[in-house]
A protein has these predicted regions:
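Buried, small/hydrophobic-residue-enriched core segments of structured protein domains
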Residues: 1-31, 40-42, 77, 83-92, ...
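N-terminal, Lys/Arg-enriched amphipathic/low-complexity engagement segments
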Residues: 30-88
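Short, positively charged
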Residues: 75-83, 163, 389-397
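Gly/Ser/Thr/Ala-enriched C-terminal appendages of enzymes
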Residues: 1-30, 44-45, 278, 283, ...
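A residue-level signal for beta-strand positions that form part of recognition/binding surfaces
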Residues: 33-35, 92, 153, 327, ...
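Short coil/turn segments at secondary-structure boundaries
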Residues: 71-72, 139-143, 157, 448-455
Length: 486
């Protein structure tokens, strides 16, 4: 059976299992707080670009159990009273999130979910699915953008994406990260992204030679970018493109040629020479062929003559790191008295120990230099913008510290839903792109390096750090038995 449009059951089975446990024990409506964060920067990068909020909003707005959902869950053995609870499900969650296009960093909350425990549990899988994928693609695009600077970047990866939804949402994420357009027509229609298409090698093969193929294409399409590497780029493809451009003159807009194979650095220089000598200095050279930021960086070091970059497989699949690794952890739970109790997850791996409590992240920016000095994590309700001085220190290597003065502090997490009601106006994609560029400009160059960037400071307020240490000590003592030594 073809799947319906409902995403409510886009979750792991154990979420439903836990929801029924909470329901049976009468704690399903207990208030809880969960936070999404990732532990390491993707691609060993100095930053990540947050993406996925728009899809999160649509997912949560439409969250309800259909009759077919209930029937299927009944077939899995869930009991009647619990199914009645699901049948009457109404979103009551309060959600805060980073804004799309904003820079985010490891070990800070980027989405925060508060509300009835069972509802918080239900949405975990979908939220992680969305954030893990889209943030990864946006970050990959930003890395490529940082290497090519102001040159056009086209997303060409649809056929290599992990299925159709990944292709269109991945395209949108790539645009947030810095792509100028896409070859994906559906993404262009849905999101208003500029679309660009040339033609494939098949066109040349159908006609048997470049000249006839280019002439046929030009008879239908005025804007012409000819793919010149089907047989021989320099001896056949480019000369044929020039011949067609000359013969048709002003009847077409000869925009340039595309190279999809071979030694692109060497070939592009020769192609540039051929085009210039033929009187087409404004014709652009488009390059594709399994490009990414590392390949492009090397091509630029070799002074390749590329004007437009088409990046497909390695962008849309985040080829060198296929998973962001974001997690969703409970940080506070309502106790028997109705008060919120901070909670922590311990681990033998230090990086997997969670940070307790409902928090806010503050982006600290120097007023004098206009650059971000770091992110400062406080308990929710603390207003850092009123402070005149912040003493920041590394939460693990506490001897690494600095004092910041004369700063602006902007909260990272903004209100999206309040008790199930959407309170956030989704911005246009153009606005998100502009916001992303402005946020990126605030980052010091040391954090932007593609290779071995400097570590961006993400520091805990002293009271959070101390509470975390105290909770670790308390939980370990309880696990070992009161008074026992480890």
């Amino acid at each position: 059976m073809y799947p319906d449009d409902s995403l409510t059951l886009h979750t792991d089975l154990y979420q439903i299992n836990m929801m029924q446990v909470y329901f049976d024990q009468g704690i399903h409506d207990k208030k809880a707080v969960f936070e999404v964060y990732f532990r390491q920067q993707p691609f060993n990068n100095g930053y990540a670009v947050f993406a996925g909020l728009e899809r999160i909003v649509h997912y949560l707005k439409d969250l309800r159990f259909s009759d077919s959902d209930i029937a299927y869950l009944e077939s899995l053995g869930y009991h009647g009273a619990f199914l009645d609870y699901l049948r009457n499900f109404k979103l009551e969650l309060t959600v805060r999130s980073a804004q799309e296009g904003g820079l985010v960093f490891a070990n800070e909350p980027i989405v925060q979910v508060e509300g009835p425990l069972a509802q918080c549990q239900l949405v975990e899988t979908a939220l992680l699915n969305i954030v893990n994928f889209q943030t990864l693609i946006a970050t990959k695009a930003a890395r490529i953008r940082s290497v090519i600077e102001d040159e056009p970047l086209m997303e060409f990866g649809t056929r290599r994406a992990q299925e159709m939804d990944a292709a269109i949402w991945g395209t949108r994420a790539a645009v947030i990260g810095g792509a100028n357009g896409t070859s994906n027509v559906r993404a262009g229609k849905i999101f208003g992204i500029p679309v660009l298409g040339t033609h494939a090698h098949a066109l040349v093969q159908v006609y048997g030679n470049d000249y006839e193929a280019f002439k046929a294409y030009a008879s239908t399409h005025r804007d012409c970018v000819f793919l010149v590497d089907t047989y021989d780029t320099l001896r056949i493809g480019v000369p044929a493109a020039i011949q067609v451009a000359r013969e048709l003159g002003d009847k077409i807009n000869f925009k340039g040629v595309r190279i999809d194979s071979g030694d692109i650095a060497y070939i592009s220089k020769k192609v540039r020479q051929q085009l210039d000598e033929a009187g087409y200095p404004d014709a652009k050279i488009y390059a594709s062929n399994d490009l990414d930021e590392n390949t492009i960086l090397n091509l630029k070091m070799q002074h390749a003559k590329i004007d437009v970059w088409g990046v497909g497989t390695k962008l849309i699949t985040a080829y060198d790191q296929p998973a962001l690794g974001a997690v969703y952890k409970i940080v506070a739970i309502e106790d028997e008295t109705g008060k919120m109790r901070n909670t922590i997850k311990l681990s033998s791996n230090a990086e997997k120990v969670s940070t307790p409590g409902k928090k806010q992240v503050w982006r600290i920016t120097s007023r004098e230099k206009g650059k971000s000095e770091g992110d400062y994590i406080t308990y929710d309700g603390v207003d850092v913008s009123d402070m005149t001085e912040i003493k920041m220190f590394h939460p693990t290597y506490t001897y690494i510290k600095k004092t910041v003065r004369n700063f602006d502090a902007v909260p990272l997490l903004v209100d999206i839903f309040k008790e199930g009601t959407l309170v956030y106006d989704l911005p246009s994609l153009t606005y998100i792109q502009d916001y992303a560029r402005k946020e990126f400009d605030k980052l010091w160059d040391e954090y932007k390096r593609v290779l071995n960037p400097q570590h961006y400071p993400v520091d805990l307020a002293r009271d959070i750090w101390q509470d975390k240490m105290d909770l670790i000590d308390k939980m370990r003592k309880e696990a070992l038995g009161e008074g026992e030594e480890e």
